[in-house]
């Protein structure tokens, strides 16, 4: 089975004016598609290397390649669902309670998550996740597409901080992009992920 580019639940222009249609189209149809193709290519090369008895010579490079591209595919697949033209506002129910318990209030959570996004050095993601060992919400910075994040973390909310996610519209003013996405975060999706993670 190969990976495939998922369809979006909304049109490319549905998140305007917060995220421009041009960004969405390039981001989904080009950048995300490249990660899908890269993950499939890495899997194919790994399979051939196993069959040919050459896995020892290529495993390190291909494992890194697979992690990067599969990370890109996974991260974007979550990110698209985390966004909605009907998004914004604040979460409710169990997710809202967990956020208040862990971070003190929604506003403090928002400040923390935004700071994590803006504090990334280079490319990466801000991630709100559920830590299964601690049984709590945590905010982490994911570097590139796959690094510097806890293995026991289930991502609930992800914000792409690669330049391709914002530069055409917001140029180098990342803070304006981060401020804008709060208007399109899909709290229903985040809440569903939280419910599934805590079962």
UniProtKB/Swiss-Prot annotation:
It comes from the Bacteria. GO terms for molecular function: metal ion binding; superoxide dismutase activity. Coiled coil: none annotated. Keywords: Manganese, Metal-binding, Oxidoreductase. Mn(2+) binds at residues 27, 76, 160, 164. InterPro entries: Fe/Mn_Superoxide_Dismutase, Mn/Fe_SOD, Mn/Fe_SOD_BS, Mn/Fe_SOD_C, Mn/Fe_SOD_N, Mn/Fe_SOD_N_sf, SOD_C_sf. It holds the Pfam family Sod_Fe_C. Binds 1 Mn(2+) ion per subunit. Belongs to the iron/manganese superoxide dismutase family. PANTHER family: SUPEROXIDE DISMUTASE 2, SUPEROXIDE DISMUTASE [MN], MITOCHONDRIAL. This is Superoxide dismutase [Mn]. It comes from Corynebacterium diphtheriae (strain ATCC 700971 / NCTC 13129 / Biotype gravis).
């Amino acid at each position: 089975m190969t990976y495939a580019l998922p369809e979006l639940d909304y049109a490319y222009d549905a998140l305007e004016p917060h995220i421009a249609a041009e960004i969405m189209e390039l981001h989904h149809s080009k950048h995300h598609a490249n990660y899908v193709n890269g993950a499939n290519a890495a899997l194919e090369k790994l399979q051939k290397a196993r069959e040919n008895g050459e896995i020892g010579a290529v495993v390190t490079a291909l494992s890194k390649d697979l992690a990067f591209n599969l990370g890109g595919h996974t991260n974007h697949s979550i990110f698209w669902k985390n966004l909605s033209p009907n998004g914004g506002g604040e979460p409710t129910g169990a997710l809202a309670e967990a956020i208040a318990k862990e971070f003190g209030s929604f506003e403090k959570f928002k400040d923390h998550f935004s700071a994590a996004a803006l504090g990334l050095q280079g490319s990466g993601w801000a991630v709100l996740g559920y830590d299964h060992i601690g049984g709590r919400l945590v905010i982490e910075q994911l570097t590139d597409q796959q690094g510097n994040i806890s293995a026991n973390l289930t991502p609930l909310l992800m914000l792409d901080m690669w330049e391709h996610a914002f530069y055409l519209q917001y140029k180098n003013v990342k803070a304006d992009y981060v401020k804008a996405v709060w208007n399109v975060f899909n709290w229903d999706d985040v809440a569903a992920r939280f419910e599934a993670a805590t079962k």
